[in-house]
UniProtKB/Swiss-Prot annotation:
Residues 1-99, 230-344 are annotated as: Disordered. Residues 243-258, 302-317 have a biased composition (Low complexity). Residues 28-38, 271-301 have a biased composition (Polar residues). This is Pre-mRNA polyadenylation factor fip1. The keyword Glycoprotein does not apply. Residues 80-92 have a biased composition (Basic and acidic residues). The lineage of its organism: Eukaryota, Fungi, Dikarya, Ascomycota, Taphrinomycotina.
């Protein structure tokens, strides 16, 4: 490689990478060089001496040693804190019976004003009614949201309740109940509360059972029955069913016989006929039946007999005429369904 090539390489390196490390160090050395003026000032500062005057007979110690002794000194021991003992006094339990008790407030007591019950005071008796004056605050005279009218209604209600439901009246009503009392006298309110808490009071009668037999309830019959036996009935040749019934005259407390009950049944109505005869028997009535005062009246049947003959194509229990359905058969509305089709 020739010198020209080496020079070109050096120039390229300088162009690409800048100055070398040696050249930089030389530049730093040159830049750090001190001027003679600065060197003279530093020498002047180092020539300053500190002189400390001491008294005769004392030895001056260097400043460095004194600083070291001050820095090395430490407290030898921590200061002791004096602890004061607290004496605990034990109090002996006092007898509660002898101790003074604060006065109790009876919340059920009725307040009084000038010795008069507050519920008995009439507001109209006050000549000067300050709560009616304009600008007056009604809460200064009536508490709990009351006003003049609601307070009067409340007083009337409280007076009525206290008069009707007083303990004295209740205990007096208990004394009138038949039966032996537990102690022979009217029980005190405390005894009465104890008895009510334990169950039904033993001196009160037990009520009769609900839904029990009527003989136990004091009844001698189950339902009213007829006093007379004036039943004029006729029998048909086909069915042999009773076709008439008489009007009841009076009611007594005797139990009816089975024959009377059968004759009074709805099946023995004069309008119902047997399936064999298909004829109606005209009932005969007793026009001389009387009610209490002996006045004779005529009895009219509530439902006249039918003059139309019945067909035997359907049961006698149904009077609805059969209607043909789309299968050209007859259907009846019976127990078999609403529209029963007799297809077969």
């Amino acid at each position: 490689m020739s010198n020209a090539d080496q020079h070109m390489d050096v120039d390229e390196d300088e162009y690409l990478y800048g100055e070398t490390i040696e050249e930089r160090n030389d530049g730093v050395t040159v830049s750090n060089a001190k001027s003679p003026e600065q060197a003279s000032e530093e020498s002047d500062d180092s020539d300053i001496e500190f002189i400390i005057e001491t008294k005769p007979g004392e030895r001056a110690e260097p400043l460095g040693g004194s600083i070291a002794t001050l820095g090395s000194t430490r407290p030898s021991a921590k200061p002791q804190v004096e602890k004061t003992a607290v004496e605990v006094k034990t109090t002996e339990p006092q007898d509660l019976s002898t101790a003074e008790t604060a006065p109790k407030v009876d919340i059920d007591a009725v307040p009084t004003i000038d010795g008069k019950n507050i519920f008995e005071i009439d507001l109209e008796s006050f000549d000067d009614k300050p709560w009616r004056k304009p600008g007056a605050d009604i809460s200064d005279y009536f508490n709990y949201g009351f006003d003049e009218f609601t307070w009067a209604a409340y007083c009337a209600k409280q007076t009525t309740l206290r008069d009707d439901f007083s303990p004295q009246k209740f205990m007096a009503s208990l004394a009138q109940i038949p039966g032996p009392l537990p102690s022979g006298n009217v029980p005190s309110p405390a005894e009465f509360q104890a008895m009510m808490a334990s169950g039904f009071p033993p001196f009160m009668p037990i009520p009769p059972p609900i839904g029990g037999p009527q003989e136990d309830m004091g009844y001698s019959r189950n339902f009213p029955v007829h006093a007379s036996s004036n039943y004029n009935t006729t029998h048909t040749s086909g069915g042999g069913v009773h076709s008439g019934a008489a009007t009841p005259n009076a009611y007594v407390n005797n139990n009816p016989s089975s024959s009377r009950r059968e004759s009074e049944s709805p099946a023995n109505s004069p309008n119902i006929t047997s399936s064999a005869g298909m004829t109606h028997a005209q009932p005969t009535h007793n026009p001389t039946s009387s009610y209490g005062n002996g006045a004779s009246t005529n009895y009219n049947a509530s439902r006249p007999p039918s003059n139309h003959p019945h067909s035997s194509n359907y049961p006698s229990s149904s009077r609805r005429k059969p209607s043909p359905d789309r299968y050209s058969n007859y259907s009846s509305r019976g127990s078999g369904g609403r529209y029963r089709r007799n297809r077969y």
